[in-house]
Amino acid sequence: MENLYDVIIIGSGPAGLSAAIYAKRAKLSSLTIEANFASGGQVLNTYEVDNYPGLPGISGMDLGSTLRAHAEKMGAEFSRERVKELVLDEEIKIVRTRKNEYHARTVILATGAEHRALNVPGEKELSGMGVSYCATCDGAFFKA
């Protein structure tokens, strides 16, 4: 069977990249499918990350790049395309994109999350400069 992997990971945020690293450490064939222009997921929109052990004050873009580089160093394979259909009710799962059809014994969905914008005036322009979407993440930036 062509394009058969032990694991296909859909999403390349921190969870997807962690799954890719662990799959390679376990000597599994894997493919990570990402729809976005860069790996990292929602963290890419974060100005400064202060709660990731060992990398205090790293930007979200740099953290995403660091996680991607780690996965690549382990031998992770990536494809930039959007998944349009999943067939998960058979032993060999099918993942279809616009361009390709892949097969896997296991599919990991790590599609992440996205904050919900309020769409109020100034929200976009002030995001990261007073407008925040995570009180737990950003609360320390606003303490007196």
Predicted region positions:
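FAD-binding core/adjacent interface of flavoenzyme oxidoreductases
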Residues: 1-10, 31, 38, 45, ...
